Amino acid sequence: TEIGIQIEQPDRPGGVLFDNMTALDNLCTSLIPKAGQHIIRKKIVSSILSEALRWFPKEMLLQPLSSWSYPERLRFSYYRWYLLNPRLLICFFPFAGQESTHHKMIIDLLVLCAQRGMAVWIISSGIDAICEKTDNEEFLRRLHYLNK
């Protein structure tokens, strides 16, 4: 995957998540085509599940995303990009409409993506206010502004 696009609210209709599918099925739908045809599907699903268990309880992964809370779904959408590992992740207004308690989670996940080697672009207004609230030094160090 060359480019990933994280929209403002990934769980809205037409977003990047499939509500009626389980979280595990959402991940498999995204990752199995990337794995290629040489790997057995059952082995891929097992690998995806074992990696996802580091982030989410198994019970949650086997439930439809429609049963998850909004913060959980938001975290899952960023986690999906973490696994897909595109070269560039473009995030459109990731903090807009979010409770301030979600800002830290989003920032931490974006830093994890950057540590994995992704270039992360944040297209947003009000980023100064976000920077004032965060204590994530790596996020602040990696942040570069383009103002026009």
Predicted regions and their residues:
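Walker B catalytic motif
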Residues: 91-96, 101
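Conserved ABC nucleotide-binding domain
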Residues: 51-70, 85
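GG-anchored amphipathic helix commonly corresponding to the ABC/SMC/Rad50 NBD signature/C-loop
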Residues: 71-91
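A short, surface-exposed alpha-helical micro-motif characterized by mixed small hydrophobic
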Residues: 130-132
